[in-house]
Amino acid sequence: MSSPNTETLTQMIEEISQKLNMLNVGVIKAEDFSDEKIEDLTYLHRMVMKKESFSPSEMQAIAQELASLRK
């Protein structure tokens, strides 16, 4: 059974991916992130969800930030 943090991570990652229209959503999985990074991911999630649209450079920066938060 998954922990509440894993479920929260999964939901946030899915929402970020949908908002950014990321094509390779399957590459980013909740299992790739430690529970210790949930605060950082929450901050990123809030930032992404507040914006209506993103420039290509912003999308790249967000993808890089997601990559840096992985285990």
UniProtKB/Swiss-Prot annotation:
> Which Pfam families does the protein's record reference?
DUF1128
According to the record, the signal peptide region is none
Question: Per the record's keyword annotation, is RNA-binding included, yes or no?
Answer: no
Keywords for the protein's UniProt record, in alphabetical order: Phosphoprotein
Record's InterPro entries? UPF0435 (IPR009507)
Key word Flavoprotein present: no
Output the superkingdom of the source species.
Bacteria
Recorded hits in HAMAP family, A to Z, give: UPF0435
Q: What protein am I looking at?
A: UPF0435 protein YfkK
**What high-level taxonomic lineage is stated for the organism?**
Bacteria, Bacillati, Bacillota, Bacilli, Bacillales
